Structures are given as structure tokens and as C-alpha cells.
Design a protein with these regions (language model features):
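Short, glycine-/small- and polar/acidic-enriched structural segments
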Residues: 21-165, 171-172, 183, 190-196, ...
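An extracytoplasmic/periplasmic, membrane-proximal ligand-sensing/linker region
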Residues: 21-31, 35-43, 51, 260-318
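Ligand-binding clefts/hinges and TM-proximal coupling segments of bilobed small-molecule sensing domains
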Residues: 19-26, 149-170, 241-279
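Extracytoplasmic/secreted envelope proteins and their assembly/folding machinery
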Residues: 53-57, 84, 99-102, 152, ...
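C-terminal motif of bacterial Sec signal peptides marking the signal peptidase cleavage site
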Residues: 15-16
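Second-shell loop/turn segments in exported
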Residues: 43-44, 142-145, 228-232, 247-254, ...
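Sec-dependent signal peptide recognition
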Residues: 2-7
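Pocket-lining segment of extracytoplasmic ligand-binding domains
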Residues: 99-100, 168-265
Length: 318
């Protein structure tokens, strides 16, 4: 009798475990579907550990995006090319990028809606041990940049300004900003383009700056969204509310200063507190408005030149 009772108890336990396991699987599937639904409804924006993304970090922290149906989700990347891949493949609806990359993606068939021209700028920093103090000294030197981006265009601008031939300056594609900084620290690169706050980090290490994108009057930073997605009524409403929150953040940063948001920069840009005090505090954040036509024209002209050179090179090899 005791054995029979024991068998019954064991069978009941097995049945209970089986039900528990199946129930757990069902709940997990439901949770996964719910997470996917929420992610799909949210407005997703690809961002980087750079200062031009600060308005989005501020808006997220102070819950300015909470009025959006579905909310906003920031997707973090360390390389501009990874951000652009995310929007090309539909993983995000928006991206903080540069005008060259955005126009390049449009040439590849992705229509973009330009919501804001950001205050992004890039500095050409040289390795202090390379003793490069002028642009003409880039002859036979390696410059870290990203192909078909603002830094690619700016490298050409720097090279052409001192009449160096294309084969005299070696462009090295290093997409990850952290890797660029590490290469500078390890004396593995002669020169490199850096945005803020990475440029400040390089300057604090006593590395010279020989060119600044602001000195050539180019404003190349942009916040752009997938045009086709934004034509949907629900997305259009989200974008309008997103823009309001973005403008509020810009006003707040301009009022209180960059250093006021020290904790956000430490968290998202992975920099030390002392570095933030060395970032130029006169940087301003403007309300959302599209890029200037003069910048668009310059970028399109440069991209056309690159395409022509590639076509001529292919024809010459035939």
C-alpha cells in the first residue's frame, strides 16, 4: 500500500512539473511577443557616444519622450557605419549620422527625412609623437576615418587645400571611435578625425589639432528618419512629439550648459568627469531644422566626384 501511495505521489509530481514547464514556456513566448510588440510600436533611434546625441539622452532621462504612443528607444552603437546599417535594415526608424552618410544611403535607395541639423563637428588630431603640425605634413601619413562619411570628405578637403595628391595621404578605415582613440594612445596611427567628446580626450593627451570642420564652414551632422516609415499616420504623430521633446532638450542644454548633464555624458559617452570640464562650454543646441542647402550641395557634389572617379577607374581597367 505504501508503495502504491509513493508511486501516485511521484506521478503527481511529474505531472505537476510537466505542467509547470509547459506553462513557463507559454509565458515566455507571450512575454517575447509582448516585448516584440512594444519594440515595434516604439520609435527607435540609433545613437553614438557623441555630444550631438546629448539632446536625446536628456529627453530620455527626463522622460520627455513619454508622451509618445509607444515611446522612444535609443539603440547604442560605437561606429557610425553600424548606426547606418541599423536604419538601412529597418532595425531603427531614425539615426544620428552625418550628411554624407545619409546622402549615400539615399543613393542606395533609402529615402530620408531630415528632421534636424546637429551641431556635430570633427577635429583632425595628430599623434604628438608623429610631429605633424600642419596639413602639408600629412604626406605619406595614415589618417583614420570612415569611408563615404563626413570624415572621408573632410580628409579630401584637407588634402586638396595643401595640394597633396590622393596617393600621398593614406585613408585608413577605422569605424569604431573607441578603437581610434586606442590607436592614438598606442601610437598606431598618424592622424585621425574625432568628434566630441573624444576630440577633447585627445587634446588632453597633448595631441595637436590641425583642422576643425567648423573652420571650413561645413555643418554636416544630421538627425534623419526613414521617409516611408514616417508617412504612416501613427509614426507621423510620434515624430511631431519627438521633435517637441528634442527642442525642449536643446533649450535645457543651452540654458544650463553641457557640464550640467555630467552624469549622462559619463554614462553614455564613457568619459571621466574631469574631461567634461574641458569640453568647450559654448557649444549650442539649436531647435530642429533641416540641413542648409549649401551643405547639401557640397556633399552631393563630392559624392558625384567620387562616383565619377570610381567609374573612370573601372573603365580604365577594362
Amino acid at each position: 500500500m505504501k508503495k502504491l501511495i509513493l508511486v501516485i505521489v511521484v506521478l503527481l509530481m511529474i505531472a505537476a512539473c510537466g505542467q509547470s514547464y509547459e506553462e513557463t514556456k507559454r509565458i515566455t513566448r507571450e512575454q517575447r511577443r509582448e516585448a516584440m510588440r512594444k519594440d515595434s510600436a516604439a520609435l527607435k533611434v540609433a545613437v553614438m557616444p557623441t555630444l550631438d546625441c546629448l539632446p536625446l539622452y536628456v529627453a530620455q532621462y527626463y522622460q520627455l519622450f513619454d508622451t509618445l504612443n509607444g515611446g522612444v528607444r535609443l539603440k547604442f552603437y560605437n561606429a557610425q557605419m553600424d548606426c547606418d546599417t541599423a536604419i538601412l535594415r529597418g532595425r531603427v526608424e531614425g539615426v544620428i549620422t552625418d550628411l554624407v552618410r545619409a546622402k549615400r544611403m539615399e543613393k542606395q535607395g533609402l529615402k530620408m527625412r531630415y528632421v534636424a541639423a546637429t551641431n556635430a563637428y570633427w577635429q583632425l588630431v595628430t599623434n604628438r609623437n608623429a610631429r605633424i603640425r600642419q596639413l602639408r605634413q600629412l604626406d605619406d601619413k595614415m589618417v583614420a576615418m570612415t569611408r563615404f562619411s563626413a570624415t572621408d570628405l573632410l580628409t579630401d578637403r584637407a588634402r586638396d587645400s595643401v595640394k597633396l595628391a590622393p596617393n600621398q595621404v593614406f585613408k585608413v578605415q577605422i569605424n569604431d571611435l573607441n578603437v581610434r582613440v586606442q590607436m592614438l594612445q598606442n601610437n598606431e596611427i598618424d592622424a585621425l578625425w574625432l568628434p566630441e567628446p573624444q576630440a577633447t580626450q585627445a587634446r588632453l593627451m597633448k595631441n595637436p589639432v590641425i583642422m576643425d570642420s567648423r573652420s571650413v564652414k561645413l555643418q554636416l551632422g544630421v538627425l534623419a528618419f526613414r521617409e516611408q516609415e514616417m508617412r504612416r499616420q501613427a509614426r507621423g504623430k510620434q515624430l511631431a512629439l519627438f521633435t517637441q521633446a528634442y527642442n525642449q532638450s536643446c533649450d535645457s542644454i543651452s540654458k544650463y550648459g553641457i557640464a550640467y548633464y555630467r552624469d549622462l555624458l559619463i554614462e553614455h559617452c564613457k568619459v571621466k568627469s574631469q574631461l567634461i570640464d574641458s569640453i568647450p562650454q559654448d557649444i549650442r543646441y539649436a531647435h530642429a531644422h533641416g540641413p542648409r542647402q549649401q551643405d547639401v550641395a557640397y556633399v552631393e557634389q563630392w559624392l558625384q566626384k567620387i562616383d565619377t572617379l570610381k567609374t573612370n577607374a573601372r573603365n580604365g581597367n577594362k
